[in-house]
A protein has these predicted regions:
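Short, intrinsically disordered terminal segments enriched in charged and Pro/Gly residues
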Residues: 1-13, 63-97, 146-183
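Short metal-binding segments enriched for Cys and/or His
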Residues: 47-74, 129-156
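Long compositionally biased, domain-poor regions of proteins
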Residues: 52-56, 60, 101, 108, ...
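Short recognition patches in nucleic-acid-associated and regulatory proteins
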Residues: 15-48, 68, 97-130
Length: 183
């Protein structure tokens, strides 16, 4: 992976790879076989929110989501992101840019989106392809948020409030009504 590709999933604050899981504090280098998600939200070219979370913590949080939300997310990603079609089209290319150049759900070019989020699954310094990496524009993120149950929104709000400096309602710059992207 070239340095430009790596930088998509490095911390915008430090310019370096994320070191720890935001939820449990595990060093992301401690277990080289444990994948982790990097999620970053941008307003224009400015990264306004970012985190890395290990697969254990990500899976545990997802299990807490209501059945209704889990089904809504699965339906959204199956119908709107068209995972199989995306996989067949992009899998042969092990380059990040084709995967994130446009919104995975509505095809809006990333360069034209007022806000967007990037998500990538990494194993050490290596990006894991299919279905990630992906880009979601702010409009599609808002649509996803509207599909979630109050229970799931509460779990996500608790995650944000626990791990970031201000409560979710105070994230004024975020495109999706005060909540960062749920990737």
């Amino acid at each position: 992976m070239d340095s430009k590709s790596q930088s998509y999933f490095h911390s915008s604050e430090t310019g370096k790879p994320f070191e720890d899981c935001i939820s449990c504090g595990l060093s992301l280098k401690e277990d080289p076989d444990l994948p982790f998600l990097v999620a970053k939200t941008f307003q224009g070219d400015e990264c306004i929110f970012e985190y890395a979370i290990c697969e254990h913590c990500r899976a545990n949080m997802a299990q807490e989501f209501s059945d209704e939300s889990q089904q809504a997310l699965a339906t959204f990603f199956t119908q709107r992101v068209r995972l199989e079609e995306r996989s067949q089209l992009l899998s042969p290319a092990k380059l990040i840019e084709p995967w994130i150049q446009q919104c995975a759900a509505c095809d809006t070019p990333r360069s034209k989106a007022k806000s967007y989020s990037l998500g990538g699954i990494l194993l050490g310094d290596t990006i894991i392809y299919d279905p990630y990496p992906l880009c979601l524009c702010g409009d599609c993120e808002e649509e996803i948020q509207s599909l979630l149950s109050q229970q799931t929104l509460g779990i996500w709000d608790d995650f944000v409030q626990t791990n970031f400096d201000c409560p979710p309602g105070q994230h004024q710059d975020l495109p999706n009504k005060g909540r960062p992207a749920l990737l």
